[in-house]
Amino acid sequence: MLCCTDESKTNKITILWEDIIMSKLRVWWIPQIGINEIFYVPVNTPEEGKKLLDTLAAYDAFQLQNNVKSDCFNVGGLQMFDEEDEDWYDWNVETDNYFYDDLDEYCKSEDCEQAEELENFQKEVFKQIDWSKIPD
């Protein structure tokens, strides 16, 4: 459940949050733009998706800095399954305060209970990357 200070906000946010938890979520990742296949990983929460996306991005950068890959043009995101339409759509969530369609923005916001944990995780993962070794 999302954190709130106002009881009336809690009810609206809880309903929206439960809709998201009840929906199916997956991370999609293309490790090299131009390939025809997409790598999918099911996740339980947007925060879990954020951690996985950060891990995949750091891993690709790590391979690039250590000459495992000669170049790296990757892309990824989080999708949610709409059971009514029976199709996958880019993730989004609406709170009383804001409409989020950017996972990074949501995970840094006051609406995300795990914002501090996710920031620490991202720092820990990306501190292994020497960005000066990554070509522009």
Would you name each region that the model predicts?
Residues 1-2, 70:
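Secreted/extracellular small peptides and ectodomain modules produced from precursors
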Residues 2-21:
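Short, Lys/Arg-enriched N-terminal segments with co-localized hydrophobic residues
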Residues 6-8, 31, 82-86:
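Acidic surface patches and DE-rich sequence motifs
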Residues 21-36:
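Short aromatic-glycine-(Arg/Gly/Cys) micro-motifs in beta-strand/loop hairpins
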Residues 36-47:
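A short, exposed loop/beta-hairpin motif centered on an aromatic-Gly-Thr core
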Residues 52-112:
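Acidic, low-complexity, intrinsically disordered interaction modules
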Residues 133-136:
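Short acidic DE-rich linear segments
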